[in-house]
Regions:
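Single-stranded nucleic-acid nicking/binding segments centered on His-rich, glycine/basic loops
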Residues: 1-3, 9-10, 60-72, 79-179
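Active-site acidic/histidine clusters and adjacent loop/turn architecture
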Residues: 11-39
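A general structural signal for short secondary-structure junctions and capping/turn motifs
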Residues: 16-17, 48-50, 64-68
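Envelope-exposed proteins and targeting segments
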Residues: 22, 54, 70-72
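Structured core elements
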Residues: 25, 57, 75-77
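Short, charged/polar micro-motifs that form catalytic or ligand-binding hotspots
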Residues: 27, 31, 35, 76, ...
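A short, contiguous, amphipathic alpha-helix enriched in charged residues
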Residues: 30-60, 116-123
Length: 179
């Protein structure tokens, strides 16, 4: 039950302004069926739970109306604390400072992020191959891939809503005609 989980996450913290969750957002391949996208998101979320020992909750979002039909994505929330027999316990590796991670012989936050991106690449590519697609996901940036494509600027929810209503938006999608 989601509400029980997130109430427990709030209750586990002593500070009222404590972080109770980390979000990982992943783009789901639009070439996959809804069932295949769900299986991929579920597998990745389970991998995060297994790796960090935390509770994981996720939601899949599909494109809205006449927007980019390829914008299938998942929002994955991880508790900041590990799941233990009595409830939520110590902070997970993802929440520790690099100084402490290094002292414990664990990957730094930068290395953890790279590993998550590699894990997503591996899982997404496996699911694409199983579905008969020869497309591949690459975890690297455009620059690291040697592409001279400028990354687009994320509009954000409020600017997107204004744009959909036909209002003037300073931060409009620059790649709309390249879709």
């Amino acid at each position: 039950d989601r509400s029980t989980l997130w109430n427990a996450a709030e209750f586990a913290e002593a500070r009222k302004d404590a972080r109770v969750a980390r979000e990982v957002e992943v783009a789901l391949p639009h070439e996959l069926t809804p069932e295949q996208r769900l299986a991929l998101a579920r597998e990745f979320a389970q991998g995060l739970a297994d790796r960090y020992g935390v509770a994981v909750d996720f939601a899949i979002h599909s494109p809205h109306g006449d927007t980019d039909v390829r914008n299938h994505h998942a929002h994955i929330l991880l508790t900041t604390r590990k799941v233990e027999r009595e409830g939520l316990g110590e902070k997970s590796e993802m929440e520790l400072e690099n100084k402490r991670l290094i002292a414990l012989g664990l990957p730094t936050s930068h290395d953890q992020l790279r590993d998550l991106r590699l894990d997503w690449e591996d899982r997404a590519n496996r699911h694409l191959a199983l579905a008969g697609h020869d497309l591949r996901v690459d975890h690297r940036s455009h620059q690291a891939c040697g592409l001279e494509i400028e990354p687009t600027q994320h509009m954000g929810v409020h600017a997107t809503q204004m744009d959909r209503r036909g209002k003037s938006v300073v931060r409009a999608r620059q790649d709309a005609d390249q879709a």
